C-alpha cells in the first residue's frame, strides 16, 4: 500500500501519528519544514522509530544519516553512513524516496521487509520531506513501525 496525500486518520500506529502531527506543526504554512526545525528533545519517545536520510543530487543518491533502534533491530544491523543502493532489496524503496523528493509531500507505505533478513515481517513507513531552501528536498525523515510478532515469553499470563 502506497498512500498520498495522507491525513492523521490514515495512520494506524500512534507513534507514526504523533510524528506526522509534529511534522505538520513545525512545517507551519510552508511546503515543508527545515531539518533545523526538528528538535529530537521534543519527541524523545519517537526516536527509536526515526530514520533520517540525506538527499544527494547529480547523481541522486540517499545516505543513511541516522537510524533508530527499532530499525537496527528489524534489519539486524546498522547501516548508518551507508548509501541506499548498497543495501540489498532496496530498489522499490528508492522509487518511493525519489517520489517524495519530486512531490514534496508525505506518504504512508505498508509492505514487507524485503531489505532485511526478516522479510516475512510487515512494516509501515511514513515519509516526511525536509528542505533547507524551502523548495528542494534535501533530507527525508521516515517514521518506521515494524509489525513484530508477540513473543510468548513476554506476554503476561491471563
PLM segments and residue spans:
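Intrinsically disordered, low-complexity terminal regulatory regions
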Residues: 1-158
